[in-house]
């Protein structure tokens, strides 16, 4: 990923499989920020060091907020550091990140390692990308993962994309901005690899 020039990465649930210290050691080799706004240590700091980042291209500032399913302890409880971390509802963590970002960005993108709909928390939706969007409608781009299904839709002005596992396809998001960096058109395309 360093070789490919990644701008950022969002944690997935499998990064936690060997415990948080091992994950942090491995991810420490990344030359880009690894994002997890909703998983913090006892001091309230993201376990990866960052919850969001701003990427600037061609004068456009894109805020990327990363969240992972807060269900990690269901699968990995008992592994080193897992039970010491705090797993916040993704919709709440995204809202806090958007508040922190304020007017620093022209475009808000959320990279959510979770499906559109709740996997375990059907009442609260803490693990639902749809709940993130419902509570934070100012999101411009929502990238989803975890369920390994294709998602290609638009809700309001938000484009949403998700792809299958194994690198079989990628989601391409196209945004058209005016001279003031306001989005005037957006689309998502799922591209077979």
Spans of model-derived segments:
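Acidic, metal/ion-coordinating pockets
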Residues: 1-193
